[in-house]
């Protein structure tokens, strides 16, 4: 598994170079773009059992068109099963093999961010979401609530309110009531929705001015 050790080194370098680079752009006025390619879970083969994982490893070893999606799917399974270091190494392999301008790259950042966030690595997750936005012309609908969640979780609460305000500006009838969160954010956990409800309460108490 030398390639996993190589991947771990690559990821360590990636995280080291971005650790101090968590400055987000100021929120834009509106975020209407669906950005479906980014927010779709990376799945090469349906399933999450040992047989599926073995087939995914075969795709990785063949290094064909689906190899990086297979790596990302394996990485998620590894991180969710307690093998975080191996999962990180697998993600690093996928990043190394994916061009900066590839549509897959933003999806890798988005998926890796969620895996990091759910392991309690909120600052790292925030930086991965930032990179999912970097250099792109879209203004994705996922960005305001997701960045609000990450910023609030890292203690950057004024910035979290700015991003939540962008969600409300974009879809005021959707984001002005946390009761809608289960419908709007079906893949979020209850704890994540509760955290966003804290952001909402703070925004409601003192909504930031625009611009």
Predicted features along the sequence, with ranges:
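Bacterial N-terminal signal peptides that target proteins for export
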Residues: 1-8
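Bacterial N-terminal signal peptides
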Residues: 8-16
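N-terminal leader/linker segments that initiate helical-solenoid repeat arrays
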Residues: 19-73
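Solenoid-like repeat scaffolds
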Residues: 25-26, 56-65, 92-101, 130-138, ...
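Conserved small-residue packing positions in alpha-helical repeats and bundles
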Residues: 40-41, 75, 113, 148
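Alpha-helical adaptor scaffolds
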Residues: 73-141
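Terminal, low-structured helical/coil segments at or just beyond the last alpha-helical repeat
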Residues: 166-211
